[in-house]
């Protein structure tokens, strides 16, 4: 998002330019200033001697300045109409001699007259203080002009080194100070600063995102589009007597596009769009959050119609005075102020408040009522069709192989959010660069899916052949149960390459995506999770089962517990014993259930029954298909990774799929790729469907023929009966 108020200023660049400008000005001043010639210290003493010997006011020193920082002596010497300006690079002792003098000479001057002093020049040349001599000369010749007292127009001045340094740097320092003060003023204007901490933290943003940049989420987009249209054409809705909605809350899992939808709203609305994170309200000072809320709504009212978008609303919107930690006065004050501003005494005509959160369930009820957030829209995880659209959107501008089919990728990514799907495409792009391929190929897409789900493969991990074989049996067990138990999860991909903390990895998806599941389907799903453990028990015995089923058991137990405590699918009856409270620190009660220890024991028994029954289903399915188990295991040991099409080929033909290199009788090699294998399986399935349809049609014809025969026989019997009568 780009700030609309002010463009971003590169202060570092400005400071550098300012310093360069100051240095350039200093160089120019030095370049065009009058030039002074360097002279020796003896040359200066010679002029001192000439001035001392002169009996008129024509020879004198107009100025002598001694810089104690570098011991340079600046001199302006007058000899009649001639004016000579020069400087002397003196030593520290020479400069000190001119300003401090010689104790012996000063004593002579106190006792002798000027002539004696002049005589001393000849005998003590270079050892006297001419400054002291000037004072003595003026004291003995009061009639001389003070400005031209035979020697000096001014006293010798010893400049302070610090003052000299300040004179050299004052201009660059002034520029730097001005720039610094401007930067601090701009910072205070943006964030309130120490002198105005309660200043509005929301920024007016402008973005080029549109609703066309969002794939999936059609219902949320329609809801938001209506509000944007209201802001653009309020008269149309006013004529119908419609009230402008005050707020819209976007909820749902992380990564589903809530903030992206807000960006698109900003791009479409063409009205001031205030963006702020809820965590920006509460900071150091008491009452700061409430003040910032007031300032934000005050500015929004001035620019109405406008939209205020508060991201991560649960940071300040959680239920008041609840949870383990109790209430938080500062957060609750901020929430109270938001409630008042959204629906209080002050009117908010033309202001739409949008909020986004992952936890709508922990928000305060007063925040969710109509009149504040009139609409609560759930931006959920995309279904298979929406996943395909999202993948196509994020693939724009990327070079993809023609073999890649987005519908198959969507089928292999159930439960993925939009952010995860974008990450899949990005990971595949990075793999393409790493492997130096011109285009993104299907194997890179498969690897990207695995990386997003379970992390990168640990190919360097050393695993014994026996352990690898056990992992292959475990993963093959999942595949067999998925194929043979109706309603269970189907394995889309299996690998025995370690990922994360797991020795192997399998991707299981339901036969079709459904919003509701029957008890039979849930039991089949649990059975598919227990397929790995069942295979271990059959092959190695109950005493040699491994820890590889840890995650499977966890998932199976979670489903079984919900069947008992939430969905009423057990002998305990249709009673809800537990609430879904995974994190009590988000404003929930700590206790998950309202039942005693006896009921908890009964719940555990029912969960055990469900899992045990499902495990028996898995064991039975594998025992009846041991040959299929062995074939899938062999394929895994040979290839390390297999996909759903290869598993279906093995089930259909009860043999391993052809290798990538198949030798012809004449010795030439023929490549059989995975796409050909998939087509073979699909063609076989299509033929089976046609065959089954033909059988059904034949059976239907036979039934019709039998019915006609029966009707004919019945009619003849009725005719005979009539004749008999």
UniProtKB/Swiss-Prot annotation:
Its EC number is 3.4.24.-. GO terms for biological process: protein catabolic process; proteolysis. Binds 1 zinc ion per subunit. Zn(2+) binds at residues 474, 478, 552. Keywords: ATP-binding, Cell membrane, Hydrolase, Membrane, Metal-binding, Metalloprotease, Nucleotide-binding, Protease, Transmembrane, Transmembrane helix, Zinc. One of its GO terms (cellular component) is plasma membrane. One of its GO terms (molecular function) is ATP hydrolysis activity. Residues 680-725 are annotated as: Disordered. Pfam families: AAA, AAA_lid_3, Peptidase_M41. It is found in: Cell membrane. SUPFAM superfamilies: FtsH protease domain-like (SSF140990), P-loop containing nucleoside triphosphate hydrolases (SSF52540). It is a multi-pass membrane protein. The active site is at 475. Coiled coil: none annotated. Its main location: membrane. ATP binds at residues 252-259. Residues 684-725 have a biased composition (Basic and acidic residues). Its cofactor is Zn(2+). Residues 1-11, 182-725 are cytoplasmic. Residues 33-160 are extracellular. In the central section; belongs to the AAA ATPase family. Homohexamer. Acts as a processive, ATP-dependent zinc metallopeptidase for both cytoplasmic and membrane proteins. Plays a role in the quality control of integral membrane proteins. This is ATP-dependent zinc metalloprotease FtsH. It comes from Mycoplasmopsis pulmonis (strain UAB CTIP). The gene is ftsH.
